[in-house]
Amino acid sequence: MKRASGVGHLVPFLPGLGSLLEDPEVSEIMINGPANVWVERAGKLEPHEAPGLTGAWLHRAAIHIARPLGLDPATRPVLDARLGDGSRVAICTPPAAPEVAITIRRFGGRAFSAEDLVRMGSLPEPVLEAARRTLLARRNVLVSGGTGSGKTTLLNALIELLPEDERIVAIEDTLELRIDRANCLRFEAGATHDTPVSIRDLVRHALRHRPDHIVVGEVRGAEAADLLQALNTGHGGSLTTVHANNAKSALSRLASCAMQAGDALPWEVTCRGVVDGIALVLHTTRREGRRFVEEALEVRGYDAAAGRWATAPVWGGAAELPEEAKTHTPKEVHA
């Protein structure tokens, strides 16, 4: 993906929003129109008054962002861009929207370690230890959750549990992970390449680069089949994420994605591949402005006759929790 200027370059084009663009507590700015601005600060949504922001200013901002990409909002009313500082911008202009709409997702200042997340109350200590054991045993972890639930933050923290002297190949649709490793090869998919490159293309290609561990930022489609094959053929200690409503549905979601492959195996066989490929599922959620691991399951098997996953709770749900954990109140993760 091509890059426009950093988020600081937008300040002159967005009157009344300069303080937000410079506030490290602000993770997302949502401009629905000149009189309808919302901001996510410390995990909570709140309205923001920007009296000087007009439709004309929003139009200028859209042009300023699009021009370095060789695009024109007049002919391309829906576009995505990554700014020079890693922040992401989504723009929608008329006629696709009543007014110019711009959403800015700021790139975080630093990555949180697993220990940081434990201290914040976002990652229970038993879950961290289960993840550590799983990865060091060269078994694989699936992180699930909804949009904005902290999946990427958790994934980034778990990567740091991998041995320092081993090679990581990370594959993302948009570069968001902050991986501080010398021997890490990063791939980015995208439709803006002259020759479009998909996540599935990159998962297949990654195997030629001798990875000890494969990290896929998010599985959405047929690439799940290739990833499961890799996980089941010697690339243990790998990680990925998937959108799902709970930990068990994450397993079904991963299997469903794998079934989208043109050469997909039967459902029962695919589910057995998920069982062989995934040892631990960590489900994240966001509630009342807080992001935290709500549930963790060990994957034990799949009952084809009943159509059910066999799992063992590690945290949440039916897990045996200490009394203090039952009243656990997680704090916010700003990422």
Predicted regions mapped to residue ranges:
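The Walker A (P-loop) glycine that initiates the GxxxxGKT/S ATP-binding motif of P-loop NTPases
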Residues: 145
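N-terminal anchoring/assembly modules that precede and organize ATP-driven motor systems
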Residues: 1-47
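P-loop NTP-binding catalytic core
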Residues: 23, 40, 46-137
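Conserved lysine of the Walker
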Residues: 151
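Walker A (P-loop) phosphate-binding loop of P-loop NTPases
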Residues: 148
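Conserved P-loop NTPase
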Residues: 98, 273-335
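Active-site phosphate-binding and catalytic loops of NTP-dependent enzymes
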Residues: 12-19, 65-82, 166, 261-268
